C-alpha cells in the first residue's frame, strides 16, 4: 500500500439551531472538552499533514477556541476556511480546495461527531489507498434522516452506486438500512475534479458532497464502504438531548477502560471525567466524583463520595474523604503520600501538601506548602503560608494574608503549635517549636521555642447580674 500525505477537512460551519444556544455547536463540551477538540485530537493521532476547519456560524469564536487547544492536537498544523453563505456539504468542501495539495488523501470529518476512533479511520484510509473513494457506513434499525447507501445488488459486498439523501430518497431507497456516516476518504486530485461537477438540483437546493459517489462510478473509480457496527462512533450532536446521551456513552466507555486497568469504581454510572484521569494500581473511587482537567491518582489512593477534583496530583496512599473540593486551576494542587484530606475540605490553586499531612473538615488551603506531618484538622484557613513539619494548626485559626492591595506570606516553622481561634497577620514568622496561645492575634514574629499570647486580659466581675427584660418589650 502506497503512503500518501493525509489532509483532514473538518465541517464546523453549522449553527446548530436545535441546540438552542448562542454557543457554536462544535464548541459544546463532551467530557469537559469541545466536540471539535475531540475531532482534532483524532486527526492528530492519524499523523495528518494538516487539518482544515471549515467555519461559518460563530467563526471567530471557533477559531479562537482552536488557537487555545491543548492535548494531542496541540502541534497539529491547522488552517481555517470560511463557508459564507452555507450552501451544503459539497459547497463547504469546495472552500477548502485551495489549501489541499493534489498529492494527498482528503479525509472528511464532522466537527460535531466526537467519538470516532483513530483505528476506525485508519481502516477507512487503508480502503482508500490513494485510488478509491472510501465511505464509512453503518447499518441502522431506524435510518430516518440519514443518506442511504445504494448498491448495485442486494449483497453486502455489492458495488456502491450512490448515496441518496433522505429527503431525496424514494420509498424503496428509504427502506435501505445501510447509511452514510458523513465520513469519507478520497484522493484529493479526484475530489477536486468531482467537486467541479456538483449542482444543486435537489429538494434542498444544496450542493451535496455525497453526489461525488455517482461521479466516481461514472469515471470507473471504485467506491468502497467500510461498515462498522458501533453507532456511537458516528453519532452526531444536534440537540442537548443527543449531547447528554453521547456524554453517557463517553463516560461509560472511559469507566470501563479504568476498571480494565484495575481501578475500583463503586458505580461506573456515577463517575464523570472531564479531562484526563490517570490512576495507579489499587485506586478506589466512590460514587458521584467529578475529575476535571489533568488529575493523577497514585497507587492505593482512595477517593470518597461526592468529591470534585481538578488539576491535581494525589500521591500514593492518600485518602480524600467525601465532599472534598480540590481545584488546582493553573497552579495545580499536590497531595503527598499518605495524606488525609476532608471531609468537606477545600484545596485551592497552589496548595502543596507533604506526606502524611492532615487537612480536616471545613479547612481551606490556598497557595501554601505544608511539610510532612503538619495538621489542620478543622475550621481553619491557610493562605500564602509555608508550614513546617509536625505543625499543629488549631481550629478556627487563620492567616490574615491580604491587606486590601497585596498578599503577604506567613511562615510557620517546624513543631509549632497554634492554638484555636488565632489570627496570624502576615507578613509574620512563627519560629520553630513556638506555641501560640488560643485566641491570639499575632502581628509580630514569634521567636523559636517561645510562648506567645496576644489577646486582651480576661476580667471576671463577681456578682454580676444580667439585664432583665422590661415587661411588654
From Swiss-Prot:
<feature type="active site" description="Proton acceptor">
    <location>
        <position position="378"/>
    </location>
</feature>
<feature type="binding site">
    <location>
        <position position="392"/>
    </location>
    <ligand>
        <name>UDP-N-acetyl-alpha-D-glucosamine</name>
    </ligand>
</feature>
<dbReference type="GO" id="GO:0000902">
    <property type="term" value="P:cell morphogenesis"/>
</dbReference>
<dbReference type="InterPro" id="IPR038009">
    <property type="entry name" value="GlmU_C_LbH"/>
</dbReference>
<feature type="binding site">
    <location>
        <position position="238"/>
    </location>
    <ligand>
        <name>Mg(2+)</name>
    </ligand>
</feature>
<keyword id="KW-0012">Acyltransferase</keyword>
<feature type="binding site">
    <location>
        <position position="83"/>
    </location>
    <ligand>
        <name>UDP-N-acetyl-alpha-D-glucosamine</name>
    </ligand>
</feature>
<dbReference type="GO" id="GO:0009245">
    <property type="term" value="P:lipid A biosynthetic process"/>
</dbReference>
<feature type="binding site">
    <location>
        <position position="25"/>
    </location>
    <ligand>
        <name>UDP-N-acetyl-alpha-D-glucosamine</name>
    </ligand>
</feature>
<feature type="binding site">
    <location>
        <position position="395"/>
    </location>
    <ligand>
        <name>acetyl-CoA</name>
    </ligand>
</feature>
<dbReference type="GO" id="GO:0019134">
    <property type="term" value="F:glucosamine-1-phosphate N-acetyltransferase activity"/>
</dbReference>
<keyword id="KW-0961">Cell wall biogenesis/degradation</keyword>
<dbReference type="GO" id="GO:0003977">
    <property type="term" value="F:UDP-N-acetylglucosamine diphosphorylase activity"/>
</dbReference>
<dbReference type="InterPro" id="IPR011004">
    <property type="entry name" value="Trimer_LpxA-like_sf"/>
</dbReference>
<comment type="similarity">
    <text>In the C-terminal section; belongs to the transferase hexapeptide repeat family.</text>
</comment>
<feature type="region of interest" description="Pyrophosphorylase">
    <location>
        <begin position="1"/>
        <end position="240"/>
    </location>
</feature>
<feature type="binding site">
    <location>
        <position position="238"/>
    </location>
    <ligand>
        <name>UDP-N-acetyl-alpha-D-glucosamine</name>
    </ligand>
</feature>
<dbReference type="InterPro" id="IPR050065">
    <property type="entry name" value="GlmU-like"/>
</dbReference>
<keyword id="KW-0573">Peptidoglycan synthesis</keyword>
<dbReference type="GO" id="GO:0009252">
    <property type="term" value="P:peptidoglycan biosynthetic process"/>
</dbReference>
<dbReference type="Pfam" id="PF12804">
    <property type="entry name" value="NTP_transf_3"/>
</dbReference>
<keyword id="KW-0677">Repeat</keyword>
<dbReference type="GO" id="GO:0005737">
    <property type="term" value="C:cytoplasm"/>
</dbReference>
<feature type="binding site">
    <location>
        <position position="147"/>
    </location>
    <ligand>
        <name>UDP-N-acetyl-alpha-D-glucosamine</name>
    </ligand>
</feature>
<dbReference type="GO" id="GO:0016020">
    <property type="term" value="C:membrane"/>
</dbReference>
<comment type="pathway">
    <text>Nucleotide-sugar biosynthesis; UDP-N-acetyl-alpha-D-glucosamine biosynthesis; N-acetyl-alpha-D-glucosamine 1-phosphate from alpha-D-glucosamine 6-phosphate (route II): step 2/2.</text>
</comment>
<keyword id="KW-0808">Transferase</keyword>
<feature type="binding site">
    <location>
        <position position="455"/>
    </location>
    <ligand>
        <name>acetyl-CoA</name>
    </ligand>
</feature>
<comment type="pathway">
    <text>Nucleotide-sugar biosynthesis; UDP-N-acetyl-alpha-D-glucosamine biosynthesis; UDP-N-acetyl-alpha-D-glucosamine from N-acetyl-alpha-D-glucosamine 1-phosphate: step 1/1.</text>
</comment>
<dbReference type="InterPro" id="IPR029044">
    <property type="entry name" value="Nucleotide-diphossugar_trans"/>
</dbReference>
<dbReference type="InterPro" id="IPR001451">
    <property type="entry name" value="Hexapep"/>
</dbReference>
<feature type="binding site">
    <location>
        <begin position="110"/>
        <end position="112"/>
    </location>
    <ligand>
        <name>UDP-N-acetyl-alpha-D-glucosamine</name>
    </ligand>
</feature>
<dbReference type="InterPro" id="IPR005882">
    <property type="entry name" value="Bifunctional_GlmU"/>
</dbReference>
<keyword id="KW-0548">Nucleotidyltransferase</keyword>
<feature type="binding site">
    <location>
        <position position="165"/>
    </location>
    <ligand>
        <name>UDP-N-acetyl-alpha-D-glucosamine</name>
    </ligand>
</feature>
<keyword id="KW-0133">Cell shape</keyword>
<feature type="region of interest" description="N-acetyltransferase">
    <location>
        <begin position="262"/>
        <end position="473"/>
    </location>
</feature>
<feature type="binding site">
    <location>
        <position position="420"/>
    </location>
    <ligand>
        <name>acetyl-CoA</name>
    </ligand>
</feature>
<keyword id="KW-0511">Multifunctional enzyme</keyword>
<dbReference type="Pfam" id="PF00132">
    <property type="entry name" value="Hexapep"/>
</dbReference>
<feature type="binding site">
    <location>
        <position position="381"/>
    </location>
    <ligand>
        <name>UDP-N-acetyl-alpha-D-glucosamine</name>
    </ligand>
</feature>
<feature type="binding site">
    <location>
        <position position="348"/>
    </location>
    <ligand>
        <name>UDP-N-acetyl-alpha-D-glucosamine</name>
    </ligand>
</feature>
Amino acid at each position: 500500500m502506497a503512503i500518501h500525505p493525509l489532509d483532514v477537512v473538518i465541517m464546523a460551519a453549522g449553527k446548530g439551531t436545535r441546540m438552542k444556544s448562542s454557543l457554536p455547536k462544535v464548541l459544546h463540551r463532551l467530557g469537559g472538552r469541545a466536540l471539535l477538540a475531540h475531532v482534532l485530537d483524532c486527526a492528530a493521532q492519524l499523523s495528518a499533514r494538516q487539518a482544515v476547519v471549515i467555519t461559518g456560524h460563530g467563526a471567530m469564536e471557533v477559531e479562537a477556541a482552536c488557537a487555545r487547544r491543548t492535548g494531542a492536537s496541540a502541534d497539529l498544523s491547522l488552517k481555517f476556511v470560511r463557508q459564507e453563505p452555507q450552501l451544503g456539504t459539497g459547497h463547504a468542501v469546495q472552500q477548502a480546495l485551495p489549501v489541499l495539495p493534489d498529492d494527498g488523501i482528503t479525509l472528511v470529518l464532522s466537527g460535531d461527531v466526537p467519538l470516532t476512533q483513530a483505528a476506525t479511520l485508519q481502516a477507512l484510509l487503508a480502503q482508500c489507498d490513494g485510488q478509491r473513494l472510501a465511505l464509512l457506513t453503518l447499518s441502522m434499525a431506524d435510518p430516518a434522516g440519514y443518506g442511504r447507501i445504494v448498491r448495485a445488488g442486494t449483497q453486502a459486498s455489492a458495488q456502491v452506486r450512490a448515496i441518496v439523501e433522505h429527503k431525496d430518497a424514494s420509498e424503496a431507497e428509504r427502506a435501505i438500512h445501510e447509511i452514510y456516516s458523513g465520513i469519507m476518504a478520497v484522493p484529493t486530485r479526484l475530489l477536486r475534479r468531482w467537486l467541479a461537477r456538483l449542482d444543486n438540483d435537489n429538494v434542498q437546493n444544496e450542493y451535496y458532497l455525497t453526489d461525488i459517489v455517482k461521479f466516481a462510478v461514472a469515471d470507473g473509480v471504485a467506491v468502497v464502504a467500510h461498515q462498522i457496527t458501533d453507532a456511537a462512533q458516528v453519532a452526531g450532536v444536534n440537540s442537548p438531548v443527543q449531547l447528554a446521551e453521547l456524554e453517557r456513552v463517553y463516560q461509560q466507555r472511559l469507566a470501563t477502560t479504568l476498571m480494565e486497568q484495575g481501578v475500583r469504581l463503586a458505580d461506573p454510572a456515577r463517575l464523570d471525567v472531564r479531562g484526563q484521569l490517570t490512576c495507579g494500581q489499587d485506586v478506589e473511587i466512590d460514587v458521584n466524583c467529578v475529575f476535571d482537567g489533568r488529575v493523577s491518582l497514585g497507587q492505593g489512593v482512595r477517593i470518597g463520595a461526592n468529591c470534585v477534583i481538578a488539576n491535581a496530583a494525589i500521591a500514593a496512599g492518600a485518602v480524600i474523604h467525601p465532599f472534598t473540593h480540590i481545584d488546582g486551576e493553573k497552579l495545580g494542587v499536590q497531595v503527598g503520600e499518605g495524606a488525609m484530606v476532608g471531609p468537606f475540605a477545600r484545596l485551592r490553586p497552589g496548595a502543596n501538601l507533604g506526606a502524611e499531612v492532615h487537612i480536616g473538615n471545613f479547612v481551606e488551603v490556598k497557595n501554601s506548602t505544608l511539610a510532612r506531618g503538619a495538621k489542620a484538622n478543622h475550621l481553619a484557613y491557610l493562605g500564602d503560608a509555608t508550614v513546617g513539619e509536625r505543625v499543629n494548626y488549631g481550629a478556627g485559626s487563620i492567616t490574615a494574608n491580604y491587606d486590601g492591595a497585596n498578599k503577604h506570606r506567613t511562615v510557620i516553622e517546624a513543631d509549632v503549635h497554634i492554638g484555636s481561634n488565632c489570627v496570624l497577620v502576615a507578613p509574620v514568622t512563627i519560629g520553630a517549636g513556638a506555641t501560640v496561645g488560643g485566641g491570639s492575634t499575632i502581628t509580630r514574629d514569634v521567636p523559636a521555642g517561645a510562648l506567645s499570647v496576644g489577646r486582651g486580659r480576661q476580667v471576671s466581675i463577681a456578682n454580676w447580674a444580667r439585664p432583665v427584660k422590661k415587661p411588654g418589650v
